[in-house]
């Protein structure tokens, strides 16, 4: 897929999911759509684990989305849920979506630990680099995905080390290609 095709797929994805998003009903479709149609991942359902079981304090919990080959753990919330506020979870513990994901990650076997944690509420995607001493969210809104989708290459590429420096050039190049593509369409 060319950059222009990916950008267009990202635009269509953003338009399709604007104003939609129920955690239980739409979470799986959202990520399958993004991984396959925007990032071009083949055989998504064979390569991604949905509702992966993890035992926390003796209770079985479920990780919404886990991508084993890139060690990405995704905690999905419904549209409108704030990603920076504590929410009462099924264990009657108030945690932010990141804290909930980190708790799951802390209870995974060492070889399955997340390299990246993502929290999402359908309108926002926050990425945390678990190699950072103090992980801070890189925030992408749904409307920004057409210009910033390369930041989400962490979902499919094992070799991404940081998402700021190496992606900045790619995003700028993508912006230029996108402008050229749009100019040719006129």
Go through each PLM region and give its residues:
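Acidic-basic catalytic patches of nuclease active cores, encompassing PD-(D/E)XK
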Residues: 14-49
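Short, solvent-exposed loop/turn elements at beta->coil junctions and helix N-caps
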Residues: 49-56
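Broad hydrophobic/π-residue packing in well-ordered secondary structure
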Residues: 30, 39-43, 65, 104, ...
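Short, basic/polar, glycine-containing "phosphate-handling" surface segments that engage DNA
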Residues: 1-18, 56-59, 63, 70-72, ...
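Central hydrophobic cores of alpha-helical transmembrane segments in multi-pass inner-membrane proteins
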Residues: 34, 39, 67, 72-74
């Amino acid at each position: 897929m060319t950059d222009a095709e990916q950008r267009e797929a990202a635009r269509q994805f953003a338009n399709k999911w604007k104003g939609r998003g129920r955690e239980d009903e739409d979470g799986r479709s959202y990520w399958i759509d993004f991984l396959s149609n925007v990032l071009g991942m083949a055989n998504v359902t064979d390569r991604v684990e949905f509702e992966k079981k993890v035992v926390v304090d003796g209770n079985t919990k479920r990780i919404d989305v886990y991508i084993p080959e890139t060690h990405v753990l995704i905690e999905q919330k419904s549209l409108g849920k704030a990603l920076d506020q504590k929410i009462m979870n099924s264990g009657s513990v108030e945690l932010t979506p990141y804290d909930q994901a980190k708790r799951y990650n802390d209870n995974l076997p060492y070889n399955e630990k997340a390299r990246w944690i993502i929290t999402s509420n359908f309108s926002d995607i926050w990425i945390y680099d678990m190699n950072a001493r103090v992980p801070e969210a890189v925030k992408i809104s749904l409307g920004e995905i057409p210009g910033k989708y390369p930041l989400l290459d962490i979902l499919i590429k094992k070799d991404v080390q940081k998402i700021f420096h190496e992606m900045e050039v790619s995003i700028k190049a993508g912006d230029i290609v996108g402008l050229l593509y749009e100019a040719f369409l006129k």
